[in-house]
Amino acid sequence: SSSHMRILSIKNFFRKINNNNIVTISVLTPSVFRKNFDLICSPLHDKDKLKDLKNVLFFEGSLAQVSDLEPDNQIGLIGLGGVNKHFIFHENDLIKQIEYILSLYPKKQWYVFTSRRTPEMMIQKINQLKKIYENISISTEGFDEIIKKASIKIITQDSVNMVYESLSCKGKTILFNMKCKKENKVVKQ
């Protein structure tokens, strides 16, 4: 909210100096002074917050860079979120699904990316898998590069941004089977 206030202050400053109309655009829903923006680009799930405004463009999901790069059939990506309020992050169920994936695609090099929400115990379980499967590695860097190269990307449902980033690249996107805690607008997406 302080950044939105700063932007509007800068707009007023330039308006006084140049005597021109400065256009202000907010990408994502501003928390304050919504009526002062000329245009707001907002996720569809914020529609109720902005129902009184006519200067809003809604988008589905999250903003992600689109890639036309042809995927490499030798590369796969596993994206893990973590504990969240929408889905049950059951580590053992996810490990079983990962083992199944590795058995289906034994020749593919798998890159596992975790998030700051991924429990340490889950990371330890992935490290145990590395002792059995040589074609898996936990990656801390290179996500933007690998997601574009991966021919198949398997992602936990709680990682909404990662899902949309994957859908913005060529290759298959598959979601891990996870149970939702309750039906709401996030799990229905």
What name fits each language-model region?
Residues 1-59, 64:
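Active-site and donor-binding regions of nucleotide-sugar-utilizing enzymes
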Residues 40-43, 110-116, 174:
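Short internal beta-strands
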Residues 167-189:
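Nucleotide-sugar donor-binding patch of glycosyltransferase catalytic domains
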Residues 61-120:
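Active-site donor-nucleotide binding/catalytic segment of nucleotide-sugar enzymes
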Residues 18-23, 106-108, 170-172:
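A short helix->loop->beta-strand "cap" motif at the edges of active sites that frequently abuts
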Residues 126-164:
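Donor nucleotide-activated moiety binding/catalytic core segment of transferases
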Residues 7, 33-34, 47-50, 85-88, ...:
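Short, charged/polar "capping" segments at the starts of alpha-helices
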